[in-house]
UniProtKB/Swiss-Prot annotation:
Scaffolding subunit of the trimeric nuclear exosome targeting (NEXT) complex, a complex that directs a subset of non-coding short-lived RNAs for exosomal degradation. The RNA exosome is fundamental for the degradation of RNA in eukaryotic nuclei. May be involved in pre-mRNA splicing. The modification Phosphoserine is found at residues 59, 292, 347, 421, 423. Residues 395-409 have a biased composition (Pro residues). The modification Phosphotyrosine is found at residue 356. Keywords: Metal-binding, Nucleus, Phosphoprotein, Zinc, Zinc-finger. Residues 388-492 are annotated as: Disordered. Belongs to the ZCCHC8 family. This is Zinc finger CCHC domain-containing protein 8 homolog. GO terms for molecular function: RNA binding; zinc ion binding. It comes from Drosophila melanogaster. It comes from the Eukaryota. A zinc finger (CCHC-type) spans 183-200. GO terms for cellular component: catalytic step 2 spliceosome; nucleoplasm.
Length: 553
């Protein structure tokens, strides 16, 4: 029998060990399990073994020639019961032991053996007998509204190990890396020593450039520097982002279409909220000052800033002319005016900041001992007359006779007029004011009675001519009655003054300069001149901007 054949039997076997160095439990290629019956059979019948061996060799050669594989070894069983019970276990053990080698195991139930062949050619794949297969198991239906659809695909493989990808990664790392500021030598640029300890020859131009670069890099801590992602704006997509997302120039992103179903993003609505600080302001008379965008009685703690409402083209703002509204493809409704930015702001109600509004200043109440100026009295009379003219649209009264001239001033004992009479007192001015108000009331009552007595059918030209002189005479009589009869010495035109100075002329202006030094503005502040003009221009621009916002609202 060949040395590569292994015989297995459950009965007590005798083991023939070729090499003495093999440990217990270890199998070698030279170990052969032989039944005791086979030993006796070998001794008694050697010619039959040769015949069986030849027969087996011929059968093995036939199988190898047919399959094209070379035989490696065989496992033969003595009894059929042992073959049926141990066949699967032996096959699994052999396949696991020789999994890394190209070995195929075949069982032969007729000869009660398992053969191992080395694969020399690939086995042809078995062609399926059926042309097609019908799947009878139903699949879960997808919701097309929640699954985005893409019109473009990328067939290229994103290989992270390519040179371009490595270069882009390195650039991104370099951009994000922010090394700590280290002091370096202005002359050679080395960070290990300073300019004082530099051994290389001094280059003044290089030192000057390095110093300028160092000083320009320093910034004030309170200056609002530009953020890293400050250029990103919501609702606006840059060209690079559009190219990365695979959208063309006139194509709207999918998120803008989904907003038509989901509405305005709540996170950006929270961003537009402006909460009050809770600080109350009071004016001079003790009443609380309301803000420019609030009204009295409001108790809201927050409002919405209109300028922070984001515009999304295709959702709350009309898209550009070159954009195509592909709402049917995305299964969303078309653009609706009810979702526009203006209607959304209206839906917020009164909780909206409409910009700065200038309010009128509340006049403080005048003190009781304050003397009203004649200009104020005249202004109030003019306003009163204007109100009467606006209320009554009757024709004006005929011209009345001018009032009589005041009596000549009385002469003093010396026969000369005094240089100037004293001004009237406060009581006299109040009495004159009351008399003038009474005259106006009388004139208003006459006008109302005349309007009631007139009718478009009864009046004629003769009655008008008769009523005119009588009204003029009555007005003259009342004016003569109401004229003051208090005598006075002299009359001067102009604004009456209650008190006069005892000095006839003002002092010389040079006297005020004694002991006063000249003021030198911004003496200890270099490069600070011209700030007043800059502040004026800034306030002017702010004023114009506020007026523009008020006009827009």
């Amino acid at each position: 029998m060949d040395n590569s054949v292994i015989l297995i039997d459950d009965s007590q076997n005798s083991v023939v060990i070729v090499d003495d160095d093999v440990e217990d439990g270890e199998l070698e290629d030279d170990v052969v399990f032989v039944c005791p019956e086979e030993l006796t059979r070998k001794e008694i019948e050697p010619p039959t073994d040769k015949i069986e061996e030849k027969h087996s060799n011929t059968s093995i050669q036939d199988t190898t020639e047919e399959d094209g594989d070379s035989l490696v070894f065989e496992v033969r069983f003595n009894k059929e019961a042992h073959f049926t019970s141990l066949q699967q276990q032996v096959l699994v053990a052999l396949e696991g032991a020789f999994a890394d080698k190209q070995i195929v195991f075949r069982d032969n139930p007729q000869e009660l053996m398992i053969s191992a062949f080395e694969r020399s050619r690939t086995l042809p794949e078995e062609e399926p007998q059926d042309l097609f297969l019908i799947d009878t198991q139903p699949a879960a239906k997808l919701n097309a509204a929640n699954v985005p659809s893409y019109k473009r695909c990328n067939a290229d493989i994103l290989d992270e190990q390519t040179e371009e990808r490595k270069k882009l990664k390195a650039e991104a790392v370099n951009k994000c890396f922010r090394p700590k500021a280290q002091s370096s030598c202005f002359n050679c640029g080395d960070t290990e020593h300073s300019l004082r300890d530099c051994t290389k020859p001094r280059n003044n131009s290089r030192i000057t450039r390095a110093r300028k670069k160092m000083t320009s890099r320093t910034e004030r801590y309170h200056v609002d520097t530009e953020q890293r992602f400050g250029h990103i704006r919501p609702g606006k997509i840059s060209t690079k982002t559009r190219h990365a997302m695979g959208y063309s120039r006139g194509q709207l992103p999918f998120i803008f279409y989904r907003m038509r179903v989901l509405g305005y993003p709540p996170a950006w609505l929270e961003e537009a909220k402006v909460q009050s600080s809770g600080i109350a302001l009071f004016n001079a008379d003790g009443s609380e000052v309301t803000k420019s965008d609030e009204e009295e009685g409001e108790s809201e703690t927050f409002k919405y800033d209109v300028n922070k409402i984001v515009e999304y083209p295709g959702f709350n703002v009309q898209p550009k002319a070159n954009c195509f509204d592909d709402f049917k493809h995305h299964n969303v409704p078309p653009f609706q005016e009810s979702q526009s930015k203006e209607n959304f702001i209206k839906s917020l109600g009164e909780n909206v900041i409409n910009g700065y509004k200038r309010k009128k200043l509340v006049d403080l109440p005048a003190p009781h001992d304050r003397v009203p100026a004649p200009s104020e009295l005249l202004t109030s009379f003019d306003d009163y007359d204007m109100e009467l003219e606006e209320e009554t649209e009757d024709p004006p009264l005929p011209p009345s006779v001018p009032p009589p001239q005041p009596p000549p001033p009385e002469e003093c004992e010396d026969g000369e007029l005094t240089a100037r009479s004293p001004s009237p007192s406060l009581e006299d001015l109040k009495a004159q004011q009351e008399e003038l108000l009474q005259e106006l009331d009388v004139n208003a009552s006459h006008n109302t009675t005349a309007n009631e007595s007139k009718s478009p059918t009864d009046l004629d030209d003769t009655s008008e001519t008769e009523v005119g002189p009588s009204a003029a005479e009555s007005g003259n009589n009342e004016q003569s009655r109401s004229a003051p009869s208090t005598p006075f010495k002299a009359s001067y035109e102009g604004t009456p003054l209650l008190k006069f100075s005892v000095y006839d002329r003002l002092p010389v202006g040079s006297n005020f300069k004694v002991g006063v030094s000249d003021v030198i503005n911004f003496e200890n502040l270099p490069d600070s001149t011209g700030k007043y003009e800059q502040m004026k221009d800034l306030l002017k621009n702010v004023r114009e901007k506020m007026v523009k916002l008020q006009n827009e609202n």
